[in-house]
Amino acid sequence: MHLPRKSSFSLCNYRYMKFENTLAFARAMDKQDPLRKFRQRFYMPKLKGKEAIYLCGNSLGLQPKTVEKELLTELKDWRNLGVEGHLHGERPWLYYHHFFSKSIAKLTGAKEDEVVVMNQLTVNLNLMLISFYRPQGKRTKILMEAYEFPSDYYAVEQQVKLHGLDPKECIIEVLPREGEVTLRMEDVLQKIEQHKDELALVLFSAVNYYTGQLFDIKAMAATARKHGITIGIDLAHAIGNVPLKLHDWDVDFATWCSYKYLNSGPGGVSGVFVHRRHGNNPELPRLAGWWGNDEKTRFKMYKNFVPQTGAAGWQISNAPVLSMAAHKASLDIFDEAGINALRKKSETLTAYLYWLLQTDCGVNASHPTLNIITPTDKKQRGCQLSLQTKKNGKQLFDKLTAAGIIADWREPDVIRIAPVPLYNSFEDVFRFVQVVKSQL
């Protein structure tokens, strides 16, 4: 058995690792995993009374075992203190959003004043578009992926209409080349250059929800900024999955959800990033509400709105404390594990999945049933692999579910598999591939 030394594993340098298609190898890898203890911090779902192989953290992350404790803390303060919990609770609700800034800043590569936890993803995207899509003169257009998550497209389409413009004329889509599924970065950058005088905004997901492709946001932002074009990023499938450096990359704004890789529960609270150059500009147009007002004068009930400095100035209503309590439980785990360590494990875990599917199942472009459409390059993917089915895809997915696999089906023909480094193991990956092999 060709296992790396412990120090080698901690760097996850799988280029020099010889994978093996055995349960013993997978278990030995798990034994050497420095992050293995975190699996015990989550509840594992069951199917038919048996623990499932859960590979669906890209759709809904698992529940941290500390969620109940965090919720009970807030329920106890509500029960015992009533309205006084805003000032005298264990974590006073009046300042609740401040308790998340440090953790979220680390996950997004931001300054603490550049991030705030609030609302839901598409709500926040609409709030950001109000401020950052400012069509003027020739610059009226928005550049997007052709196959972006539909909710983002709905938001953009309606924002364009709010400005009295035609979405068919103002939305420029970047398409894969003929015969390809994913985008080439040179094509994205060329599209920005081609339309540099027409673009008011570049809006992209950091990781595509369908293919699992990770984009080079640094290069995209540099090209946009070179031409004075605003750039916004949807981090739904990136935050908690890959390291980010939004401030250094000079991204203008970003938003995300917390119920996927951040494991904060169904409908979990979202958040936004607003770069300091905008957060310190009180004149920037925005939709406003009392929770975004200067904290020092919020309860003076003045009519004039004075926004807080930073991303907090985009808040509208007070914090949803119970939802955010669940969010805190997960962020505490991320603080302990560290996103860079998680990424290193993830690269190896997903590489092992890729290798097993190819070597044990023969999955490739010429396979009669399955093909992996996620890029082979680790720099162009997070933990997700997307398996495109060529025939009877939903039937295969249902068979996997019946065999104890919880994965994700996306129309029209993709099974999404996401081995999450916080709670998935090499044994999970090995057993999953054995089930796939038995059904092909």
Please provide the spans of the model-predicted regions:
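Polybasic, lysine-rich low-complexity intrinsically disordered segments
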Residues: 6-7
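Pyridoxal 5′-phosphate
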Residues: 11-440
